[in-house]
């Protein structure tokens, strides 16, 4: 398959990126609430990248297992939304809301695991696209409130704006569309674009994430 070697390399690079950054965030002191959420989110993405690496072994790559893991891959969209919602509305996220947002993903996954009914996939992908669009709208409208929060709580706020949101939204769209496409039509180049876009997405979010060192005393 064309581009497969490059996709293998980018898979490993993405795993190292998510693993290293999540470790640094979760072991850093002092650590803010948003950094803890970001660290846990990136740790989950690291596990997803590790899962892809393990699937390179033919003995593990069965059709039912691959399809089942595709449903779990979709959970990454929910994980990303947790961070974005918390970033634009600090203190909003709690375990009850996490379960509420994740419950549709769990329902689709359980439905497939109980039936192995392949036609569930189009409905799942459709739900993910709708969910992503709604999250983008919510985060967009919350951006001004986020800006006010930054100005009130962080120093050097004149250098912080919500321009990152446009970049992150565009990269998220590329990442999501590529993931859906490669889930249906597996290609080496498609996987490569997905891994690169996922690293770019989180690099953008990491760069704009507030740091406790910036917080006013």
Report each predicted region and the residues it spans.
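Alpha-helical transmembrane segments of multi-pass integral membrane proteins
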Residues: 29-50, 101-102, 124-202
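Generic recognition of cysteine residues
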Residues: 80, 114, 175, 204-207
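Cytosolic nucleotide-binding catalytic cores of signal-transduction proteins
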Residues: 217
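A cytosolic-side transmembrane-helix exit/cap motif
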Residues: 57-60, 144-150, 213
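N-terminal low-complexity or simple alpha-helical regulatory segments
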Residues: 1-110, 114, 122-126
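Conserved small/polar residues in nucleotide/adenosyl-binding loops
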Residues: 207-214
């Amino acid at each position: 398959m064309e581009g497969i070697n490059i996709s293998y390399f980018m898979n490993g690079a993405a795993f190292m990126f998510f693993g290293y950054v999540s470790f640094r965030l979760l072991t850093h002191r002092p650590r803010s609430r948003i950094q803890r959420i970001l660290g846990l989110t990136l740790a989950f993405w690291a596990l997803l990248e590790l899962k892809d690496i393990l699937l390179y072994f033919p003995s593990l790559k069965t059709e039912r297992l691959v399809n089942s893991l595709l449903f779990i891959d979709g959970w990454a969209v929910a994980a990303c939304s947790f961070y974005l919602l918390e970033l634009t509305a600090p203190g909003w996220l709690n375990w009850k809301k996490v379960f509420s947002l994740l419950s549709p993903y769990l329902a689709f996954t359980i439905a497939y695991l109980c039936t192995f009914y392949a036609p569930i996939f189009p409905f799942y992908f459709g739900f993910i696209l709708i969910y992503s669009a709604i999250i983008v709208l919510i985060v967009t409208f919350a951006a001004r409130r986020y800006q006010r929060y930054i100005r009130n709580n962080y120093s050097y706020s004149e250098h912080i704006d919500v321009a990152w949101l446009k970049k992150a939204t565009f990269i998220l769209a590329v990442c999501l569309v590529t993931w859906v496409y490669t889930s249906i039509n597996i290609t080496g180049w498609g996987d490569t674009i997905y891994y690169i876009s996922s690293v770019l997405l989180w690099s953008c979010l990491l760069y704009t994430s507030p740091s406790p060192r910036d917080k006013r005393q």
